[in-house]
A protein has these predicted regions:
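Nucleic-acid-interacting cores, centered on viral/eukaryotic replication and modification enzymes
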Residues: 1-333
């Protein structure tokens, strides 16, 4: 809403306020805390703008927002990837955690999905409060010749884009018609939230619309440009709650990672060079690659066995909270 000058001034003010937070993050001594503020506070701030503005009006803001989020992440990683590696790492960082990314959702990609969802969520409310005006909007949206108002033309274009990218595969069937939305069609209740992640809009249609866009981008734009090893890594770190550790609050030793270890984990997820000291594996003597593939797979070094300890400690804490007496490292006789 508003003139082009008003929109530009408003979005520039938003960018300036966002930058005030982004400037502080690289100065923090705790990388895990800085990451949480970037992922859960700075990145989602774009959602209000991309829901309220048509994609063409939100484009300049979304591009600037995404660029500043990526620049801040590079500062936290103390590394600036270039060329194809940089493009792929940036693409991976914007994917939801369940699709193998870091969850720093790209506002440009979210914009059409969010704008369509805002209208999908609002049509019934408009009908209840302003039925005459709502009927005019519905007729305009259903017109085969295209809507008269630019905002309605843009939401029609967003709906067509979602259809082309496979909305029917998002888990709720075909995209609802404008009349169905007008009459109050709602997505199924998210009782099982294993598929959703912190920061996702789960109260309406945006989750399914955004999921359509993210899945299409992953399968048709990002993965075809990856090597076989990179695709395998991306798939192995995908799935419900596969990235839950990224949003763990460091309130106990079990959920806390040192800055060096946390940076290694972030780089590994983006397939960027790791902070390694040895040139050869201490187990089998093979040369170590800078992406950590050998270290993650070598069965001779004993590192695979060490993965069990954190899981044991987590279950020990659960049992202890339930009142059980838990003993660690008990010898089996």
């Amino acid at each position: 809403m508003g003139t082009a000058d008003f929109i530009q001034a408003h979005t520039q003010d938003r960018i300036n306020k966002e930058q005030a937070l982004l400037d502080w993050l690289p100065k923090m001594g705790d990388l895990q805390c800085a990451w949480l503020l970037l992922a859960l506070c700075a990145t989602p701030r774009a959602n209000h703008v991309v829901r309220a503005l048509p994609p063409t009006h939100a484009r300049a803001y979304a591009e600037e927002h995404d660029s500043r989020i990526w620049n801040t992440l590079q500062q936290l990683l103390c590394y600036t990837p270039t060329g194809g590696r940089g493009r792929r790492a940036r693409g991976r960082s914007t994917l939801p955690g369940r699709l193998g990314g870091l969850g720093l959702r790209e506002a440009q990609r979210t914009s059409p999905a969010a704008y369509w969802a805002s209208w999908a969520d609002a049509l019934e409310v408009i009908r209840q409060r302003r039925p005459n005006e709502a009927a005019v909007l519905l007729a305009d949206l259903e017109s085969t010749e295209g809507a008269r108002a630019q905002c309605l033309r843009e939401v029609q274009a967003a709906a067509d884009l979602l259809d082309r990218e496979g909305f029917e595969q998002a888990g709720v069937g075909a995209r609802p018609s404008w009349r169905q939305l007008f009459e109050g069609a709602r997505p199924p209740a998210q009782e099982d939230r294993r598929e959703t992640e912190p920061g996702e809009w789960i109260h309406g249609w945006q989750f399914y619309a955004s999921s359509t866009r993210e899945t299409f981008y992953r399968e048709h734009h990002l993965m075809p440009a990856m090597s076989r090893a990179a695709r395998a890594t991306l798939r192995s770190q995908s799935g419900p709650q596969a990235a839950a550790w990224l949003t763990a609050v460091p309130t106990s030793p079990a959920t806390t990672l040192s800055p060096v270890l946390f940076q290694i984990c972030l780089r590994r997820r983006l397939r960027l060079p790791l902070l390694l000291s040895n040139r050869r594996c201490e187990g089998c003597g093979a040369p170590l690659d800078d992406l950590g593939d050998h270290r993650a797979a070598c069965s001779v070094s004993g590192r695979l066995r060490r993965r069990a300890k954190p899981i044991e400690l987590a279950w020990s804490a659960v049992f202890a909270e339930a009142g059980a007496v838990v003993a660690d490292q008990v010898l089996l006789r």
